[in-house]
Curated annotation (Swiss-Prot):
<dbReference type="Pfam" id="PF01259">
    <property type="entry name" value="SAICAR_synt"/>
</dbReference>
<comment type="pathway">
    <text>Purine metabolism; IMP biosynthesis via de novo pathway; 5-amino-1-(5-phospho-D-ribosyl)imidazole-4-carboxamide from 5-amino-1-(5-phospho-D-ribosyl)imidazole-4-carboxylate: step 1/2.</text>
</comment>
<dbReference type="InterPro" id="IPR028923">
    <property type="entry name" value="SAICAR_synt/ADE2_N"/>
</dbReference>
<keyword id="KW-0436">Ligase</keyword>
<dbReference type="GO" id="GO:0006189">
    <property type="term" value="P:'de novo' IMP biosynthetic process"/>
</dbReference>
<dbReference type="GO" id="GO:0005524">
    <property type="term" value="F:ATP binding"/>
</dbReference>
<keyword id="KW-0067">ATP-binding</keyword>
<keyword id="KW-0658">Purine biosynthesis</keyword>
<keyword id="KW-0547">Nucleotide-binding</keyword>
<comment type="similarity">
    <text>Belongs to the SAICAR synthetase family.</text>
</comment>
<dbReference type="InterPro" id="IPR018236">
    <property type="entry name" value="SAICAR_synthetase_CS"/>
</dbReference>
<dbReference type="GO" id="GO:0009236">
    <property type="term" value="P:cobalamin biosynthetic process"/>
</dbReference>
<dbReference type="InterPro" id="IPR001636">
    <property type="entry name" value="SAICAR_synth"/>
</dbReference>
<dbReference type="InterPro" id="IPR050089">
    <property type="entry name" value="SAICAR_synthetase"/>
</dbReference>
<dbReference type="GO" id="GO:0004639">
    <property type="term" value="F:phosphoribosylaminoimidazolesuccinocarboxamide synthase activity"/>
</dbReference>
<dbReference type="InterPro" id="IPR033934">
    <property type="entry name" value="SAICAR_synt_PurC"/>
</dbReference>
<protein>
    <recommendedName>
        <fullName>Phosphoribosylaminoimidazole-succinocarboxamide synthase</fullName>
        <ecNumber>6.3.2.6</ecNumber>
    </recommendedName>
</protein>
Amino acid sequence: MVIVMEIYEGKAKKVIPLDDGKVIIEFKDDATAFNGKKKAQFKGKGWLNAQISAILFKVLEEKGIKTHFIGVAGDNKLIVEKLKMYPVEVVVRNVIAGSLKKRLPLKEGTELSEPIVELYYKNDDLGDPMINHYHAKVLGVSERELKEIENIALKVNNILKEYFAQRGIILVDFKLEFGKNERGEIILGDEISPDTCRFWDAETKESLDKDVFRFDKGELINAYEELYKRLTA
């Protein structure tokens, strides 16, 4: 495997393409919040996010969800299948929290009777605005693709809700990204980590995710380590 070039460096990851249809995702120790207005570094965060993502991708693969995950390529690196990513993020919400509490007249922590699926346009300059199917189709995502993406997202939710519940964790909400592989299959990509999910302790409702950093709730690394411990116990 030969590195071709570094094609992308985001706020929390580097994406490095190889010459064999694979990609390395390198998780950084950087943490950002509020569209990059709040920044910090936490030693070990990249390792934790890589390991947690690997665990969760394996869980999903075992349940029949196709993901881009191939293996762990180092302490803070994953090797994954190269995908052509959709310009849309999918957010699945099970509990009133985050931005949803500003849009619905319900108390934070209220469990939803059924999950809410939201779409967002991946564009930092525009602040990743919420969109609907009509907007997504303008961006080149067909109705058939949208339905398949949303169906996969709901299956992921069912699998992970049960998985985390067994470990004393509430899966409040989470973000997914999808792409197409060379065979034209829609595949789950990106990461599944406390950077992209909202996790609460089932008893105390304490955050085990980036909200700890975002809202100064404590030590981010302690929260991520606690999550990792529960996944590996």
